[in-house]
From Swiss-Prot:
Chief location category: plastid
Top-level division of the source organism's lineage: Eukaryota
Family label: Belongs to the intron maturase 2 family. MatK subfamily.
Name under which the protein is recorded: Maturase K
Gene from which this protein is expressed: matK
Function: Usually encoded in the trnK tRNA gene intron. Probably assists in splicing its own and other chloroplast group II introns.
InterPro entries from the UniProt entry: Domain_X, Maturase_MatK, Maturase_MatK_N
Pfam family, one: Intron_maturas2
Amino acid sequence: MEEFQGYLELNRSWQDDFLYPLILQESIYALVHNQDLGFNRSILLSKKKGYDXKYSLLVVKRLVIRMYQQNFVILSLNHSNKNAFFVPNKNLYSQRISEVFAVIAEIPVSMRVMSSLKGKERKQYKNLQSIHSIFPFLEDKFSRLNHVLDILIPHPVHPKILVQTIRYCVKDISCLHLLQLLLYEYCNNGITLKGSVSNFSKKKNQRFLLFLYNSYVCECESIFVFLRNQSSHLRSTSYGAFLARVYFYLKLEHFLKVFTKHCRVILQFFKDPFIHYIRYQGKWILASRGTFLLMTKFKYYFVNFWQCHFYLWLQTRRIYINKSLNQPIDFIGFRLSVRLNPSVVRSQMLENAFLIYNGIKKFETLVPTMSLIGSLAKEKFCNVLGHPISKPAWADLSDSDIIRRFGRMCRNLSHYYSGSSKKGGLYRIKYILRLSCARTLARKHKSTVRAFMKRLGSEFFEEFVFKEEKVISLILSRDSSISRRLYRGPIWYFDIFCIHDLASHND
């Protein structure tokens, strides 16, 4: 990638037309396929007797030409018997070129980001990359906010709108025409986060899909972030690379200097951001201290914004106004809500005594028990009512493998949902997995669950014990009552960077 960035630096005189020639370079295909993206690299290999496998520029050019043809017949390799045969595949050429396009289009975007960060010291905290790092912020902020907007990002997006969005960072006309061809080849119905994965064939065009989707979301966020920063006097400059086309940053700095010079008295009033904003996958969450009328105005602003700017018909029912999270919302596998804890204080002044009733808002993160039971029922660990059943698909494995797989699922769930306010739902899920494991083993040995568990004894449950329980009881405190109280509270971990399959075979 650095080689191609240097290539762009040396050719700034024709910087607007640099991308399309890169698509015909052999080395860019080698770069893409060496990144282990899951492709069948043999399609770009030139196989001849007496020669080693090499990436052929002629094959690359033919891929571009054959995209315009009606009959798609390719030469692929059968990995089972290594014999070549002809298989009709209409989309494979476009899949290869779309991945290369995504890699090339990321170059100018990354260069603009790096140029915007020059001269600025940015501390990188690895802990902030954890999924759990956002929940302490929610606990601190959301309990003091009045209203929350729960927004589903609208889709699908028309291909022409995507091309218009990407042209702000990719100015090569030829590449834009190629992008339009790829979009009409696959995405006649628009780009969605989930639906397009099937259109592009799973694990084959995810990079291209994410590039398109992130471009669309970035365009939405650019205008929203500008409005949000206005509420806090435009103090944020972290989105400079993506908002360069608006040319307002010089005005921003000038406005800030003038404001701090002449309006020092009311500067403190605006230090707290007016709106807190969180995005995860296809959902936005906006929280504010404003009134219900103000949040309603924001709701209809977003509706008009998507309809006028992206030509998307957004129904207002896709945006929910929740008053201080009285109704729980789903977010990153948790159920978020704010509960009012009443408290009574007795006060006495001379001979008069009176009671003061006060309510304290408490942010709660709950385990979505019903949705987890539905997932377990889908994978045949229990029925729809939550009653554990055996797992016949694992009955052929050894006893140690069966126990290890069930134990890994319990530990992963305990690790991820350790921050839940109430762990009753988590205990129920772990009970389902333990009993399902016991019934699977009893089914394998043609015995009863009671007899099998009596034979194994306590060794059976050791695999299901989460190690952090022992850490809390042994390290934090030796008092059993204190350790139990600490364990019932939320425990957030900063080493969860992605959510893997719970039944993953990798430790």
